[in-house]
Amino acid sequence: MEGSAVTGARGVPDETGARGVPDEPAPRDRPPLWNRDVVEDIWTKATLGRYRIQGGATRLRVPCFDDLTFVPCTLSRLPLEGYRERCETRTILGARNAAKPIVLERPITIAGMSYGALSKTAKTALGMAATRLGISTTTGDGGMLAEEREASHLLVYQVLPSRYGFDPAHLKMADAIEVVVGQGAKPGTGGLLLGAKVSPTIAAQRTLPEGVDQRSPVRHPDFIGPDDLQIKIEELREATNWEKPVYVKMGASRVADDIKLAVKAGADVIVLDGLEGATGASPEILLDHTAIPTMSALVEAVRALEELRVLGEVQLVVSGGIKHGADAAKALALGADAVSIGTAALTAMGADAPRYADEYHRLGYEPGDSSIWHTGLDPTGIATQEPELEARLDLEEAAERVFNFVSAMTLELQMLARACGKADVHDLEPEDMRALTLEASVITGIPLAGTDFVLSPDAIARRVAELLDKGGSDGA
């Protein structure tokens, strides 16, 4: 059976062997609700008898950083000269309790992606690029890869519910520890690695049968609530002599409550992963119908930290859909201390390369469709464990491309900060932006472009009260 039929890919063969669905009928013949994608989805489920699985992220359009724009300096404020005035990017994470906080040369990190979801070459390339950039990279479900540790100057070690590949010795080898309680692509569920990627090496590292789907548990065996999480964090601190910062990573769901509980448990850093976050494999239904967007989650998280009076003391890293320097700048302006990238780094490395178009088509996909990652047949050699495919990925070239991309992303971030008159990217603030949509204005509390009115619920309530008071006074 072809890969698309096995995995439930878009363009699954029908009973005649033809791929896909007939041409879309005219709008008057078929209501918009029952469009091509919906029909194809139903046909696929009817063929497979189960939900569909894909890699990548949601395809839905949600409120995002693109709905905000910067308003740079002109006459009322002075911008900085890019060629002679510095704009600082140095970022410190985890100084709340750790003796050795993480010091980044720029407010960007590489998100957790496992050896298993990615090839050994891809993981090593990420570590090499991060070292040159002066930023951190992160392990993933399945433990620490020796080559990744050697390549990475700053490595964050994830502690996950599965305990796959977990080694107490690796805690001391890491530069920071990240307790993962969820991710934006599939909050409320555990990790998923399809059997096609469970090679002999992966099976040995995770103590699993070769070629069998691996479904990670969703709840940590060591704690069942925030009080237990506090005990776990203290155990991790003791195991590392109180040197390593402890992060808590969560999917963007009940953000305010979760943030407050994580802070109470002693987290030094919160990593908040929004709906747009990608993954190696997930049920499609979770990608499209769970979690809240990154921008919305960030605003709620900042508000929660402000209520606890720990904004700035507990650092906030956001991920999910960060694709360029403008997204990073807007996240920092809204209150984040740093951003984390995953899909952007893999794309820079060479994922979805058009030169492999024929192979994508044979699998029922198009180049640029990162939902192929779960199949284990990624022709670029990035999201695969097939030796002949991995051999296509040149280690040095992959690392160089990630280095170039993040360097360019940093220049974009600095350019926007200078245009707003800021000598440090962390000085960006909401006042430097305007909202381009009503939704974005309501979510962020930033005035709609062309107005000075903040379309937030509190502001609307105050405005209504003012009008009512004015009406009463006029009547009197």
Positions of predicted regions on the chain:
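Hydrophobic faces of well-ordered beta-strands that scaffold small-molecule active sites
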Residues: 108-111, 135-139, 155-159, 175-179, ...
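Glycine-rich phosphate/ribose-binding loops and adjacent secondary-structure elements
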Residues: 217-390
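Mobile "lid/hinge" segments at catalytic clefts and subdomain interfaces of large enzymes
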Residues: 178-180, 186-208, 374-387, 413
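Conserved, well-structured core domains of diverse proteins
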Residues: 1-108, 112, 117-131, 135-136, ...
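Hydrophobic, small-residue-rich alpha-helical packing segments that form membrane-like cores
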Residues: 165, 187-189, 194-215, 219, ...
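Flexible, glycine/charged-enriched surface loops at secondary-structure junctions
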Residues: 140-142, 242-249, 311, 420-430
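A structural motif
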Residues: 134-135, 174, 267, 336, ...
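Gly/Ser/Thr/Ala-enriched C-terminal appendages of enzymes
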Residues: 323-328, 332-454, 459-472
